């Protein structure tokens, strides 16, 4: 399935870039008996609106329909959306944006008897991240080795 993404990514990315938006993620997956090409798009600094998503969807759909040979020979559904407030942190730009933001971290193994933390990302490097987390009534700093991170995403603080 990722072969399709590799084939269409340059086309999709050029259309998105022309509009001043950024490609966050793209996936081609099969759910039940239906194929989906899902494209997640964002715009700095305030996010992308539904009207811009509709414009991009139309342009991308038209362009994909003209490609020869067709990288998507089977019927599929094209879905464009914003990545959402709690999107995964994947790219260098995501990491920069997450700095001093509230995030969720899921771990492969426990640190201090917990496999999940939410807190403010204070710093990061290739080996570890530093989180400021709530511990009952006080805040503390937690160092998390990156190799222990199963998933990491933006989070909404309540």
Swiss-Prot record:
Alphabetical UniProt keywords: Cytoplasm, Ribosome biogenesis
Q: Where in the cell is it found?
A: Cytoplasm
Please give the start and end residues of each transmembrane region: none
* Gene Ontology biological process: ribosomal small subunit assembly; translation
Q: Which Gene3D superfamilies match?
A: Ribosome maturation factor RimP, C-terminal domain (2.30.30.180), RimP-like superfamily, N-terminal (3.30.300.70)
Q: Does the keyword Cytoplasm apply?
A: yes
Q: Has the keyword Nucleotide-binding been applied to this entry?
A: no
The main location class comes to cytoplasm
Record Pfam families: DUF150_C, RimP_N
What cellular-component terms does GO give this entry? cytosol
Q: Which family does it belong to?
A: Belongs to the RimP family.
The protein's job, in short, is: Required for maturation of 30S ribosomal subunits.
Q: What protein does this entry describe?
A: Ribosome maturation factor RimP
């Amino acid at each position: 399935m990722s072969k399709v993404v590799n084939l269409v990514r340059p086309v999709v990315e050029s259309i998105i870039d022309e509009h001043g938006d950024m490609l966050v993620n793209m996936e081609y997956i099969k759910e039940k008996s239906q194929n989906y090409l899902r494209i997640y798009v964002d715009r700095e600094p305030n996010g992308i609106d539904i009207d811009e998503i509709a414009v991009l969807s139309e342009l991308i759909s038209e362009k994909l329909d003209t490609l020869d040979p067709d990288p998507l020979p089977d019927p599929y559904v094209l879905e464009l959306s914003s990545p959402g407030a709690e999107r995964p942190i994947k790219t260098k730009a995501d990491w920069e944006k997450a700095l001093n933001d509230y995030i969720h971290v899921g771990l492969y193994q426990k640190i201090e008897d917990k496999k999940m933390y939410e807190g403010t990302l204070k710093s990061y490097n290739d080996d570890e991240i530093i989180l400021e987390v709530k511990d009952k009534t006080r805040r503390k700093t937690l160092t998390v080795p990156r190799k222990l991170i199963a998933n990491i995403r933006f989070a909404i603080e309540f």
